[in-house]
Amino acid sequence: MNFLFDTQLTKEDNLLKKFEEIHDYIYANDGLSPQQTLEEFVKILFIKIYDENDNLNQFTISSEEWNELKSGKLVHAISERITALFEQTKKAYRDIFDADDRIRISAMALGFTINKLQNISLLNSSQDAKGLAFQKFLSHHEKDGRGQFFTPEPVIDFCVAMMQPKPNEMIIDPACGSGGFLMSALRYLQQNTEGVLDVAKTVSENLFGSDINKSIARIAKMKLLLEANGKTNIHCVNSLEDLDSLKLTLGHSDGFDLVLANPPFGAKMTNPAVLSKFDLGYKWSNQNKEYHKTKAVYPNRNAEILFIERCLQLLKEGGRMAIVLPNGNFENPSLEYLRYYIKLKAKILAIVNLPQETFIPFGTGVKTSLLFLEKDTPNKDRQYPIFFGRITKLGYQGNKNGTPQYLKDKYGQVVKNELGQPALDEDFSEIVEAYKAFQSGKKVDANNSFSINYDELNGRFDYDFYSPENRKMFTKLDSGKSVRLGDICDIIKVKSKKLKDPNKTVEYVELSDINTHAYEIINSTIYQVHELPSRASYEIEDGDIVTAIAGNSVGTRKHATALVNKDFAGSICTNGFRVLRNFKIDTYYLLYFLKSDVFLKQMFMYRTGAAIPNVSDIDLANTLINLPDEKIMKDISSKMKKAFELRQESRNQIESIVLELA
């Protein structure tokens, strides 16, 4: 059966329309989920490309066959022809297909798909047309299908622009998902290479990707196949397996120039055989502020921690990497050994903080940052500057739809870029320019970027900790009379003995029971001990101060701090508080300071945790309390005390009115 291809397909929207029609037909008629529909569509594209590559002319349906299908008849020849073709396709792409994979769409949907695609050559049509069509198609369906492998395109492009890949550099994404980083690197090279980039050569020789999920790896492979009709280096493999085996699978053992990765967040690795192959799979001990690997393997580790080590292993000396990580890796005290390891193995090029809403359109509100490193195993030069940046405008809304946000002029009109397209309201490009200026030796002086020297870096990597605003605050505190909170009071963190009696009735105070403007507890809930939430912990006394150390409000204007009065003495409070007692300075002055901007900024700076922010007991004890001269302290204390007395007096008057009416 011979037919003519339409090789004049130059508008990607024509092909996109066909892709959408096929997807919508399968989804509407075959009862598959969005994810399953996408997977089946990608299988069909592989069959189509295999048929074209080998000039088999089997990806066809005659008008007679199509009419018979539409009339409700079974046409076995079509299914037999495509099934046989799929068996050959699976063998040709055995690294991303299993032998028992099958086509799961109906004969009618299969016929509809073949009829739409049979007269189009995916190999001979415009590279731009087919590549852009597939990219647009995926952008419509990836989030619905598999949000977990989707990294926001602005974040991907930003990482690539920061790393500035060069022609002939070997680039890998060891958790490649649908290939976003690799495609962005290819686009960057096309736009920034003198002359015309040899796309086929770049794809076949310089771009590598691996993913543990075959259906996702197929999408990445298809993206690259549509860009270059030749060999691709996308493999379905666990990148955390034995390093030598991984290099053998990849077919490249000399190390890579650039690693780009957004590893899976929070997935626990529990296999001791895997964990024992990583330095970071072992427990580390702290000896005089230096960490040393012990012989004890962790029972489990988050996958992204192991990916950090694997990415460094994949790099050649002097190679660079960009990796997306939850903020906990940058700040949690329990992961300081991880940051020590990174400092041992690499030069820290840059750290860029992302807004919390970055990944909300893609299924998670976890706070993340970007870490940019250069492999430097000898690590001789410890005197170098480190760039810090903060993204505040993403170019899209932090809602489930990720609606684009466009830059507007003072009249509210959307601004156009140099290509005449609406310009996104983002500051990724501003940070890239600031980083390039930093690389050239210029002083960083932008709104959301700064630099520090390596010797100023302590056990944390987060933007807020080193921001110029916070550094100025500490300089001011250090120059005045300041004391550690832990030196002027006891910080109670011992569980109440009342909790040992399961039938005892107690009053329980939560974070939400605080009037944050009035510094007071306004409510408690009566429970028997066995009914209490697991976070119920500390007994509070009259005259104590409770202050929050956990939750999204910590360090903000809604930070919960309260003076305990006799009405709530003996209550049990949540472990989201710490109880302050036995004060060495005036209680009312301390209460005032705990709501000051200086204290709140310190608490916000000390926050750690990607999901639920919290402040460690060590950091709480280390917060600095400014002590002005005695006259000012007494004046503040007197006003605070008077305010509490007036509030109590007003309550007493209201209660007396109620009694008179009774």
Give the residues covered by each predicted segment.
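A short glycine-rich beta-alpha junction/loop motif
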Residues: 371, 569-578, 607-634
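A short beta-sheet element
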Residues: 542-594
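Conserved S-adenosyl-L-methionine
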Residues: 148-261, 266-270, 326-328, 338-339, ...
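Specificity-determining recognition surfaces
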Residues: 444, 448-452, 467, 597-625
